[in-house]
C-alpha cells in the first residue's frame, strides 16, 4: 500500500474514509492491534424549526460513541431551549464494549416548506471551535463567527437549501479503545438495578475551591435563607463523579444546613439535581464536616452539561424573626468527567446556527459515523472480528496530509455543494498513484507530491532507470552494479573513489555532500576542465511547495537542469530534472521565495537573477535577466513552478541567456537549449543527455545543442544560430558578422569540447561489464534483454520506456502493441507508412478484452464503495457481475469473501407478504380466463390464480406465470361442457351479379324464362 511502484494497492483506505466517510469504515493503520469489527452507523433527524425561526445545533464531531450532538431552539426571550439529543441509529453500548471513532460527517440542510410558505429562506452559519462548549462566550448567530480566526473552520451565510457539511478530522493519533459504558451482569433486590462499565481513560478533572473561610451572616427567615456557594463551568456528556468535603463552623446554636448540587445544561436549565445534605445540624465550637460523594451515570445526562452549582440553605431550629444566623466554611471539591480528556470527546465542538427559517420548516440532519468496535461476549459468538493492519507508510501519509490541511484546503465545515465538488479531489489524495490532475487544478499538486515523496517509501532504482536490467542479472551480478551501471547506461559518472581535478565548484559540492545537502545540477566535462553546474539545496528543501502561476505573452528561452545528489566526495547521482526559463528584466515576483534576492553579474555588469553569486557569468549582456523554474509551456504562456529550488550555479544556461539577449523573442521559444557558451563563442557539451532529452520531451519540446540531440546546432555560436529552428532572421544576408559571442575569425573551424569519453574506465566498471557479458553468454534471454536496453539507450528513450513500464505493470499495452504491429512491407503498412518502418493499426478490443475491462470497471466501482473483495477475478467468476445483496450481507456480517455465484438467500431479509383480496383474485382470474360475456372461470382456475398471488407475496403474475395461466385456461375451456358456445363464423358474401352492359335502345335482354 505504501509503495508507489505497487499498482495493485494504491488506495489508502484510512484517509479516504476520513475525507469521505460515506465510502465506509477502514481500520486505523496504527500499532494498536485489537481484534475488532468495522461498522457504519447512520444518524438522521428531522428537526422542527421553532417560532423564532432560529436555532443551534451542537456537534461533537470527534466523540467516540453514540452521541453525535444536540439541538436547541431560540426562544423569543433570546435564550436557547434544549430540544433533543442527536445519536447514532444503534445504541452502541447495548452490543459493543469498546470503540474507536474512524471518521464522521454530518449534513445540515432544509428542503421542506410548511403550509402557506412558497419560498425556501434562511441562512446557516457554522464554526468549529477548538475548545469545549462551556468556553464559548458568544453563541449568537453572528457571534459564532468570532469563535475562531481560522478560515477553514468557519463558513457564513449559507442558504439552508444548500446546507453545510461537518467533517470530523482527528486531533490525535495512536489512540486506544474507549469503554462505551456498556451494561454488565448484575443482580440486586431492585429489578431496575443497572451496572455499567464506564471509560476511565483520560478523565477530565475540575478542582473547585468551594469556600476559603467564607463568612455567612443573615437573619432568620421562615423556610431558610438560600445562597449559591459556588458556580463553575464544566463540560460533560458522559458519566461523572463529584468528591470532596466542606467544613463549617458556627457560634450560633440550632443552625441547620441543607446543600444541593445542580448540574446545569447549555440552555441554563437544571438537568440533574442532587441533595447532598438535608437538615444537617451544626455543632458550635467544632468543625462540622459535610462530605460530597456523587456519581452521575451517563443515562441520566439527557443533554450536554456546561456548569455546576452548589446551593446552601441555612435555617434555625426554633428560630424566630430577627434571630441572627452566621457560619464560616472552607473546603474544595473535585468533579471528574469519565473519559473527558480523550481527544475528541469534549473538544473540538462544531456549532451550526440557522436563522430566519420559516416557522414549522424541517431542518434535516443526516450523516454517517464509522467505528472500530469490539463486541460484547454475547455478540462475539456470532460476529467475526479481525486485526487491523499496521501500515506506517499510510499512517505517516495521513498525518502529513492532515498536518497541511490548511494549505491543502481541507476544512471541517463546508457548503455541501463545495464538499461534493471536492470528493474527486479527496479520492485523488487517497490514491498514491494518481497523477494529481484535480489537485493541480486546485493548486495543491506540489504540496501533495512533496508529502508523498517524504511519507511513502519508494523502491530505489538506478538512474537512468535500469532496474529491469539489474533485476534480470540476478543476485549474483546485482551487487557488482551500482554507480557503474549508471555509467554503462550512458550517464557520465566519475570513477568511485577516484578524485577529479579540483575546482571551486567541486569543492563546494564536496562540502555540501559532507553536510548531507541535496544538489540540483547540470554536469558536463571538457578536457582538463571538469566543471559542475548545479544548485546547492539545504536538507529537506523539497518538503514545501506553493501554488502555480501562469505568465502570458512573455518572451522566454528554455534550458533543462538536472537534479542530483552527491553520494560521496566526487560522485553525483542524478535523481530528477527541471526546465528553467530565461525572462527579460528583474522579475523576482515570478521566482519561488527560495531564489529571490540571489543574482550573478555578467561581464558587462548586468545581473542574472536566480543564479547563486558564484563568480562572474562569462557573457556580455545588454540588460538584466531572471531565471525561473517552470512546469509547462504553451503557445504564448508558461506555467511557473513554485517548488522551493535554490539558486543555480554554473554555466549551462549561458546558451539560453545569450539567445535571449540577441534575439529577444516575444513569445516563449518552444525548443530547449543545452550547452555551456564561453567567452570565445565555443559551446561545450554536457552530460546526462538522456535525462535532458526526457525533460524536454515531457513538455513536448525538442532539445537543441551540440551533438546527438533533436537539433544538432554544432560546436560554436555561429553554427548554432544558423541551425537553430526558431531563428527569426534571414540568413541569406549574413547579418551576424558583428554579433556578440562570435569569434574574430568566423571561418575558423571549431572542435568539439567533449573529446574524451563520457566516463572513465575503472576496475569496478570492467568487472561489471565482464559479469554482464558472462551472464549474456549463458542466458540467451538476458542477451536479448541487454540488446533491448542498448537499443533504448542509443535512441535516448530509456526514461520514456521506464515511465511507460510504470504505467503498464502487467505489459498488457505492450503486448497489444507488438501483437498489432504490422510487418514491414504489408499492404496496410505500405498504404500508411510507405515501404519501410513499423506502425500500429487501430482495432477495437476483443470480446475477452472488453469483458475484462468491464470486470475491472465493476471492481473499481465496488472499491470506491468500500467493497474490497470484489476484485476483477472475483467479478469474472461471479458471472461478470457485481456482488448480489445476499453476498454483500454475507460479507458485512462475517467479513469473509463470499463464494461467486452463491446468492446467500438466508442473509437477505424475507420480503413481506401482502394478502390479496378475494375480489382482486376473482377479477384477475376472470380477466385471464376469458373476455367479458364469456363463461365465468371455474373454481379450479380461481384457485390456480390464488396460488400465484400467494407465491408472489400478494403481487400479480409475471410473464412466465401469465403464460402458464393462459395455457391452463385453454385446457379448462376445452374440458368444460358448460363453456360458452363459440360465436358463429360470418358467412362469406355472395358475389354480386354483374350488371348487364348497354345493348341498345331496341334490343330486349334475354332472361332465364325465355330460355326455358
UniProtKB/Swiss-Prot annotation:
This is Structural polyprotein. Residues 513-755 form the Peptidase S50 domain. Its EC number is 3.4.21.-. It comes from Avian infectious bursal disease virus. The active site is at residues 652, 692. Changing residue 80 to L: In strain: Isolate Indian. It holds the Pfam family Birna_VP3. Keywords: Capsid protein, Host cytoplasm, Hydrolase, Metal-binding, Protease, Serine protease, T=13 icosahedral capsid protein, Virion. The record marks 441-442, 487-488, 494-495, 501-502, 512-513, 755-756 as: Cleavage. The sequence shown is that of isolate CEF94. Residues 975-986 have a biased composition (Basic residues). Residues 1003-1012 are annotated as: Interaction with VP1 protein. The keyword Cytoplasm does not apply. Specific enzymatic cleavages yield mature proteins. The capsid assembly seems to be regulated by polyprotein processing. The protease VP4 cleaves itself off the polyprotein, thus releasing pre-VP2 and VP3 within the infected cell. During capsid assembly, the C-terminus of pre-VP2 is further processed by VP4, giving rise to VP2, the external capsid protein and three small peptides that all stay closely associated with the capsid. Capsid protein VP2 self assembles to form an icosahedral capsid with a T=13 symmetry, about 70 nm in diameter, and consisting of 260 VP2 trimers. The capsid encapsulates the genomic dsRNA. VP2 is also involved in attachment and entry into the host cell by interacting with host ITGA4/ITGB1. The precursor of VP2 plays an important role in capsid assembly. First, pre-VP2 and VP2 oligomers assemble to form a procapsid. Then, the pre-VP2 intermediates may be processed into VP2 proteins by proteolytic cleavage mediated by VP4 to obtain the mature virion. The final capsid is composed of pentamers and hexamers but VP2 has a natural tendency to assemble into all-pentameric structures. Therefore pre-VP2 may be required to allow formation of the hexameric structures. A divalent metal cation binds at residue 30. One of its GO terms (biological process) is proteolysis. It is an enzyme of class 3 (hydrolase). Changing residue 253 to Q: In strain: Isolate Indian. It comes from the Viruses. Residues 969-1012 are annotated as: Disordered. GO terms for cellular component: host cell cytoplasm; T=13 icosahedral viral capsid. Changing residue 409 to A: In strain: Isolate Indian. GO terms for molecular function: identical protein binding; metal ion binding; serine-type peptidase activity; structural molecule activity.
